[in-house]
Amino acid sequence: MVPDQHSNTYLEPSSSLPLTCTRAGTCCHGKMVWINPWELTRLAEASGEGVAAFAERCCEYGGIRLRFDGPPGWKGLPACRLYAAERGCSVHAARPLSCRLYPLGRERQVKTVRYLHQGIRFPCLEGCADVRDLPALTVQDYLVGQDVTPGEAAQDAYLEVMQELAEAALILLIDGGLAGQGDHQVLPRWRGLGAAHPRGLVQAIAPDWLSALTLPGFACDSADPARFAAVHFAQLQERAQRLFASLREADALREASCTMMALALHLGRALGSSPDQLVHRWIITAKKHGARE
């Protein structure tokens, strides 16, 4: 059987690969770099801008993806908005986890973490052939050199925030009494949110809620990303309790549940997850409590 060229190659910490960067900037062109709120805040601070101003200038979809609309480079692909041909990344010290990891990826299932690269052939060989002439590194040494620990802590902490937001959507549906009454309006809306284009999902979230999710209004503690995420979630939780705790009317509960689900899915996309797959899992849970499509 011929291996699937699009499948992932999973790696061991001791796997040795041509991971010494050529500094050619190839990987700063034509990519999709999703960022979480901690990363957005770090990038804004490194740029000397407020978070909202930086997100408007350098990001898409409310601040969860970096813009790649700079001058064309390798294969005519556009550069990241933060890339400068004469000096490389303008915020290198604050670069997001996905940039630090590249060409590797990180996959987390519950508490198991695996590292991988896309395809059978090592990705850097096409755009940076000179990498063969540079020292090989083990995966473990590469990760240490890229200082991925803070970014991984932020990613994992925001995965927990995503789950808590989805739990809030489920609580509004289930504890609010809708699921037990066989509600058939909420789940189709959830399904639609999961299938929506990123722009459509942004439009489904009220602007004040979108800002609360993606533009946290406090300074970044780069040494403690987990605390940053915890403070951010506490703000979101307080807002949800203030607005939704006293709801009793069915339509209001439906709207609140869909709001929390939209927030969970939007954050999930920022973390590299598939909203469609995420919402399918949460719909299964809701159906066990009586909700219907």
Predicted regions and their residues:
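Short loop/turn segments that flank or connect secondary-structure elements
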Residues: 1-26, 33-41, 45-79, 83-88, ...
